[in-house]
């Protein structure tokens, strides 16, 4: 089977947004106008095609990034293939956003025209910057009360530090919003309400908007010519670029992430979606426009590149594992190079295991189509893989490569969980392990002493949904304990310790002496080990044992048994015995050495501090600030946003449980908040004593 669409006609993109910016609705409209969805699904009634897990339909928020393939005929009459990844906007699911951004070539950032740049918009924007994803901006909900396109443009500059290139101006706003001005063609598009947005009239720019349109077209040209020397010179000499040249410059600047073309409309009222789809074709990159993916040669460790080309060796990245009720476990993968056939044997280089591709599916939200072959640039769902987890590389066994791994955040909250009936214990273990394979920001462990199962994740909502999915998908009812904070411990001062481990009980004994300097790691939260042994007082082959011994103690700190952060250990001296010394003896010595040193080095308890942003009507500002202060919060500042006030604070996670209920009652349901992990900070001594008393009894 030959490739149906050329790779330059592919657009792999996602839609990223704040929780209520209208992402699912916009995706729905795209599916509707591209002919894949015959009935428009509204999130309000829980029937959107992309939101296909039951909890998403109930909560009206998108949780899993479903991948959808659809097609669009551009302005030139040529059909392009769109692979759309739907990304979640709720902060507890930022891991999903990271995963999707990793495999996208471009993105549409949605803004709510009333709120502009919201906290979660900043979070997903920063994640997109990390992966250097070209972005366009769609200012949605122009029909909403308080919609302000020009304020949103300004906020992109002040909040995100980015340059928005305005491509359209809105005609009217709020209930009067009826169309847009196209600043390249310099005409107006007015939608016909009765045709569900399928038809619009191209008319002259309204008289009262001509001057503004001229002003913004000039700004547009000034910004885009800056990226090209010849275009700048021509412009300075009074030669303006023609429309095709403007489009070419906008495309280049977007792909190089110099600026972001900005459009507007209202997906819910079906206005502005088709020009946005034309813009995806015109300005977002094809797989050929982005740099070749880099990887490490599996055998030699040399850096290699894989280009988006069917004739190159197969390389792909697994970016999502999902349980499908009909097919079982599905692995979503992006093919970067080469082609893949159903039934093929592929190499998982991260696990060093071979896998066989059973079925290969093209996904449309929650319906599927079996395919025999897939090519570079495709996003496919594979059934039958046993070993592969998120972030693994799959490739040609004869040309193995490891593509760069994704980074996953550490969980900040944990709860104990147990099945309601003893008979469900095994079923629960299976369900939790299956869910952990799907979601690397979710962890499962057994508490060694109490034997309890502990689950950890990115927030209360994250863990709520895990428990909910266990009930729905695996039919396991579970009881959960109170949420517990993922505290950490560290040391605060330098200490030097000399320790000798000696054991003699007939036959071979054990002997190891170590002298180690322990101090806070100036480079961050990781553990750092150095050896400054000269003259062989500790033979080279025993030094890994010294490091391993210290690392084994780091998982349980001296104060309350929490994992330790930010420790640096330097081995400066030691002694060994020709017969009695071994790697194990040095491991035991360094372990005991660190245990003794940790308290002397000023052990300190750390707690996760959350960045909290509360948006509240002015009437409740005093109450909100007073309440945050009572939670040991540090107010970082406040600013007006329209008629509301935005309060920024750093608050310990321990004091934020059930905050949503308090905030609702305090503001009569009118205030909202978002919370993201910010950093670990020392716990005040009075609170630390309580925590130690509580946990040392348990450990």
Curated annotation (Swiss-Prot):
Gene3D superfamilies, sorted: 3.30.230.10, 3.30.70.240, Elongation Factor G (Translational Gtpase), domain 3, P-loop containing nucleotide triphosphate hydrolases, Translation factors
Domain tr-type G: from-to ranges: 8-288
Example GO BP: ribosome disassembly
Gene Ontology molecular-function annotations: GTP binding; GTPase activity; translation elongation factor activity
A single cellular component GO annotation: cytoplasm
Principal location: cytoplasm
Sequence positions that bind GTP: 17-24, 86-90, 140-143
Protein name per its UniProtKB record: Elongation factor G
Organism: Rhizobium rhizogenes (strain K84 / ATCC BAA-868)
């Amino acid at each position: 089977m030959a490739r149906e669409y050329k790779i330059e006609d592919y657009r792999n993109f996602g839609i990223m947004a704040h929780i209520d910016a209208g992402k699912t609705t916009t995706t729905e409209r795209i599916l509707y106008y591209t002919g894949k969805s015959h009935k428009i699904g509204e999130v309000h009634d829980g029937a959107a095609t992309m939101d296909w897990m039951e909890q998403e339909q109930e909560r009206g928020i998108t949780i899993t990034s479903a991948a959808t393939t659809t097609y669009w005929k551009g302005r030139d009459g040529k059909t392009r293939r769109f692979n759309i990844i739907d990304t979640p906007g709720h902060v507890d699911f930022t891991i999903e956003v990271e995963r999707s951004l990793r495999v996208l070539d471009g993105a549409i950032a949605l803004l709510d025209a009333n709120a502009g740049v919201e906290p979660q918009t900043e979070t997903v924007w920063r994640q997109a910057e990390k992966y250097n994803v070209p972005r366009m901006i769609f200012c949605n909900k122009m029909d909403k009360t308080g919609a302000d396109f020009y304020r949103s443009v300004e906020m992109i500059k002040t909040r995100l530090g980015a340059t928005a290139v305005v491509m359209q101006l809105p005609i009217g706003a709020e209930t009067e919003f009826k169309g847009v001005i196209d600043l390249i063609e310099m005409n107006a598009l007015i939608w016909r309400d009765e045709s569900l947005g399928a038809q619009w009239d191209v008319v002259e720019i309204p008289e009262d908007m001509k001057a503004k349109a001229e002003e913004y077209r000039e700004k547009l040209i000034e910004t885009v010519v800056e990226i090209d020397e010849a275009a700048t010179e021509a412009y300075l000499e009074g030669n303006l670029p023609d429309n095709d040249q403007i489009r070419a410059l906008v495309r280049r600047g977007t792909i190089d992430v110099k600026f972001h073309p900005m459009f507007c409309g209202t997906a819910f009222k079906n206005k502005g979606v088709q020009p946005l789809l034309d813009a995806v074709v015109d300005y977002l990159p094809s797989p050929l426009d982005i740099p070749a993916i880099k990887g490490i040669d599996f055998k030699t460790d040399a850096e290699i590149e894989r280009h988006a080309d069917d004739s190159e060796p197969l390389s792909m990245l697994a970016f999502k594992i999902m349980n499908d009720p009909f097919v079982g476990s599905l692995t979503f993968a992006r093919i970067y190079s080469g082609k893949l056939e159903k039934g093929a044997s592929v190499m998982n280089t991260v696990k060093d295991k071979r896998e066989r591709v059973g079925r290969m599916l093209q996904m449309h939200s929650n319906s599927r189509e079996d395919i025999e072959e897939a090519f570079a640039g495709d996003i496919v769902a594979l059934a039958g893989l046993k070993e592969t987890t998120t972030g693994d590389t799959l490739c040609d066994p004869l040309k193995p490569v490891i593509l760069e791994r994704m980074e996953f955040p550490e969980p900040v909250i944990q709860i104990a969980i147990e099945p309601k009936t003893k008979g469900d214990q095994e079923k629960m273990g299976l369900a939790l392990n299956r869910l952990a394979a799907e979601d690397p920001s979710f962890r499962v462990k057994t508490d060694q002493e109490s034997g309890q199962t502990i689950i950890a994740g990115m927030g209360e909502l994250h863990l709520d949904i895990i428990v909910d999915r266990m009930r729905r998908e695996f039919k396991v009812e579970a009881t959960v304990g109170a949420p517990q904070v993922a505290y950490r411990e560290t040391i605060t001062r330098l200490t030097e310790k000399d320790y000798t481990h000696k054991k003699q009980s007939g036959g071979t004994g054990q002997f190891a002496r170590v002298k180690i300097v322990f101090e806070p790691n100036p480079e961050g939260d990781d553990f750092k080990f150095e050896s400054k042994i000269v003259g062989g007082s500790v033979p080279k082959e025993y030094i890994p044992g010294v490091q391993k011994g210290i690392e084994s103690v780091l998982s349980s700190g001296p104060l309350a048994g929490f994992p330790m952060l930010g420790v640096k250990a330097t081995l400066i001296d030691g002694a060994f015995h020709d017969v009695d010394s071994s790697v194990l003896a040095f491991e035991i010595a360094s372990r005991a050495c660190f245990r003794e040193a940790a308290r002397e080095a000023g052990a300190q308890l750390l707690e996760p501090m959350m960045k909290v942003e509360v948006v509240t009507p002015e009437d409740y500002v005093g109450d909100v600030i007073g309440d945050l202060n009572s939670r040991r919060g540090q107010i970082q500042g406040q600013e007006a946003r329209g008629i509301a006030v935005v309060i920024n604070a750093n608050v310990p996670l321990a004091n934020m449980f059930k905050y949503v209920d308090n905030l609702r009652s305090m503001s009569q349901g009118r205030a909202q908040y978002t919370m993201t992990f910010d950093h670990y900070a020392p716990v005040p001594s009075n609170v630390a004593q309580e925590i130690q008393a509580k946990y040392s009894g348990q450990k």
